[in-house]
């Protein structure tokens, strides 16, 4: 009910008012959730019989980007070049019915070692209003997955119903998190390792990849932090557990200096500095894998839900 009301009213509420309201709500809840955010100690246990990461790496590093709008789409080349210079690779998730994603851009990303995924169809929040609505949208999403030769999916706003996602022709989903009580759907999966979601009815299964670092939008836009301590602290904990460090960073919110800073932006320098920190602090210790590579590995060792 809350989500339906939110999406019905959202177009009529000025964006700065939306941000002020969310910031006030988060401030009011911060003390309540201090024991489970940004670190939930109960999420750190590895799966039974966990064999570790390939090549005996200490942890996995998975960089992902959700491209929410045209502004973010136009910044993808700058972000890709930044990651290339620092010798990182990532995935880019696009919203196919919100803006046009050119075949040339997808081809460029893939040819340079990046991955392309599908990020829903739009951002109207109606995917789970009924089983019929989701089934219809799943058919359309599957067409984009096939057209793009993509194997991964992330739902807008991290909404999720893992049992319904079996309608999608995917190898992995990335619509959950270990802990994030400030999300519209705050139910975390309570783990920092990927896992397999099986459908006993028809044998279909996919790998679930929860994000394990707080999203950039929360840290830099809503909390308005101008430092990297939250990311560093959480990463140190995940690394200590040998888990998967999975980050979502949005090019929409990164300002590369081409325009004046807007209310929903932070300096792209923050992300670059974080990548340099990871490279220099954990050199040789991480497996910088694409989501599809994580999925393929988990399937080989069959880590079940």
Give, region by region, the residue ranges found by the protein language model.
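Short, well-ordered coil/turn segments that N-cap beta-strands
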Residues: 57-61, 86-90, 111-116, 146-151, ...
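Generic structural signal for well-ordered alpha-helices
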Residues: 47-48, 76, 80, 103-107, ...
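Active-site beta->alpha N-cap acidic-glycine motif
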Residues: 29-115, 157, 161, 223, ...
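Membrane-proximal basic amphipathic "stem/tether" segments
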Residues: 1-37
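Acidic-and-aromatic substrate-binding clefts and catalytic sites of carbohydrate-active enzymes
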Residues: 68-74, 93-104, 124-135, 152-163, ...
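Conserved, mostly hydrophobic/aromatic
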Residues: 9, 66, 116-119, 153, ...
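Active-site-adjacent pocket scaffolds in enzyme catalytic domains
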Residues: 27-33, 142-243
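C-terminal domain-boundary segment and adjacent tail
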Residues: 44-47, 55, 228-305
């Amino acid at each position: 009910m809350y989500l339906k009301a939110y999406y019905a009213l959202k177009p009529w509420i000025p964006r700065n008012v939306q941000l002020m309201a969310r910031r006030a709500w988060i401030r009011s809840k911060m003390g309540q959730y201090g024991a489970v955010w940004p670190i939930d100690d109960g999420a750190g246990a590895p799966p039974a019989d966990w064999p570790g990461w390939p090549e005996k790496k200490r942890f996995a590093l998975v960089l992902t980007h959700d491209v929410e709008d045209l502004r973010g789409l136009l910044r993808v080349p700058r972000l890709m070049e930044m990651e290339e210079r620092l010798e990182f690779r990532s995935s880019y998730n696009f919203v196919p019915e919100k803006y046009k994603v050119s075949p040339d851009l997808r081809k460029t990303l893939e040819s340079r070692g990046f991955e392309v995924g599908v990020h829903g169809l739009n951002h109207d929040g109606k995917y789970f209003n009924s089983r019929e609505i989701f089934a219809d949208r799943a058919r359309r999403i599957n067409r984009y997955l096939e057209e793009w030769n993509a194997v991964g999916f992330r739902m807008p706003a991290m909404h999720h119903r893992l049992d319904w996602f079996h309608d999608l022709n995917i190898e992995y989903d990335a619509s959950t998190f270990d802990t994030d009580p400030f999300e519209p759907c705050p139910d975390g999966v309570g783990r920092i390792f990927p896992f397999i979601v099986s459908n006993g009815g028809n044998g279909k299964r996919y790998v679930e990849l929860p994000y394990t670092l707080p999203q950039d939008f929360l840290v830099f836009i809503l909390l308005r932090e101008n430092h990297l301590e939250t990311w560093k602290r959480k990463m140190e904990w995940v690394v200590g557990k040998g888990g998967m460090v999975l980050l979502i960073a949005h090019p929409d919110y990164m300002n590369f200096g081409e325009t004046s800073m807007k209310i929903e932006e932070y300096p792209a320098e923050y992300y670059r500095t974080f990548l340099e920190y990871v490279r220099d602090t954990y050199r040789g210790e991480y497996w910088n894998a694409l989501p599809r590579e994580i999925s393929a590995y988990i399937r080989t060792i069959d880590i079940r839900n």
